[in-house]
Amino acid sequence: MSADSSGKTGYTYADAGVDIDAGNALVKAIGPLVKATMRPGADGEIGGFGGFFDPGAAGYKDPLLVAGNDGVGTKLKLAIDTQRHDTVGIDLVAMCVNDLIVQGAEPLFFLDYFATGKLQNGVAERVIAGIAEGCKLAGCALIGGETAEMPGMYAEGDYDLAGFCVGAVERGEQLTGTKVAPGHVLLGLASSGIHSNGYSLVRRLAADKGWKLDRPALFDNERLLIEHLLEPTRIYVASLLPAVRAGEIDALAHITGGGLLENIPRVLPQGAHAVIDADAWEQPRLMAFLQAQGGIEPGEMARTFNCGIGMVLAVTPDKVEAVTARLNEAGETVHRIGTIEAGEKGCTVRGSTGTWSATADWETRHLG
């Protein structure tokens, strides 16, 4: 409580657990981070009631705006529990901007929402620094956000994140998947790790199996297990955008919750069925570790994790070589993982004996 010149006392917002000064200090601290993300069309100032963006200054003539929002899921809890806050902001941006590029849109600007019970220990600054880094990787401007200090809403040390992104694509150039037809080739871009889906199962395994997160991974003596688990989600925007604008890609699927099995059909028209050959790429060691630890069946892996493929492209056979070369040059690892066949809209993933630890040839399917 505070006292005025007459000696009277009264409640303050700080008495209730909200530190306005801490919030103002945070805005000041992140100012340089925000300015570092600026691009044509953005004004570079934060702290107002909203952020401005001029699509014309970004070079657009007749743009369609594409919007998306997402979070990081329970990967966030793993970061909180291990006090590793520096990369979940990259995950937040990645989950949003990768959802925009699959529609042919260039991410233009991003806003974040950070909520916690109490601002402390520089956690928010570290998280927002990661968000700014993700924005730079994606080429979009961080034009604003909301930091909410809400006593009593969260356990001590906990926080939540949400991201909001808007992109643009010139009218008529958006990716809708309607051009995909039997004969199209499916290319897969390697993921950087688990990305941001499947962490409720990961955390359950960690608890049940007693994993030592701060020790070297069983499959990699040179890196801690927690470092593998918190590897940031790969941002594919910079490498994919030139190919998208060149008209070389007919559909893109971001492999998130639901895995390969359920995400690929989201971008297919009726009459197109994706057939994925799991023998076409090597299962990442981290995925093999998760599968072995949980005794997870191949079909469950295909609908839970990205299994080493973070983005799937549908291209015509005559463009496979050029697209592969372009993406390799951009730093992507590209696998030819399947084809589109005539059939009910959906996806089949199949593998031979030994693939994904299977004891026999296997197949799993999702329709719709």
UniProtKB/Swiss-Prot annotation:
Disulfide bonds: none annotated. It comes from the Bacteria. GO terms for cellular component: cytosol. Its EC number is 6.3.3.1. GO terms for biological process: 'de novo' IMP biosynthetic process; adenine biosynthetic process. Pathway: Purine metabolism; IMP biosynthesis via de novo pathway; 5-amino-1-(5-phospho-D-ribosyl)imidazole from N(2)-formyl-N(1)-(5-phospho-D-ribosyl)glycinamide: step 2/2. One of its GO terms (molecular function) is phosphoribosylamine-glycine ligase activity. It is an enzyme of class 6 (ligase). Pfam families: AIRS, AIRS_C. Gene3D superfamilies: PurM-like C-terminal domain (3.90.650.10), PurM-like, N-terminal domain (3.30.1330.10). InterPro entries: PurM-like_C_dom, PurM-like_C_sf, PurM-like_N, PurM-like_N_sf, PurM_cligase. It is found in: Cytoplasm. Keywords: ATP-binding, Cytoplasm, Ligase, Nucleotide-binding, Purine biosynthesis. HAMAP family: AIRS. This is Phosphoribosylformylglycinamidine cyclo-ligase. It comes from Erythrobacter litoralis (strain HTCC2594). The gene is purM.
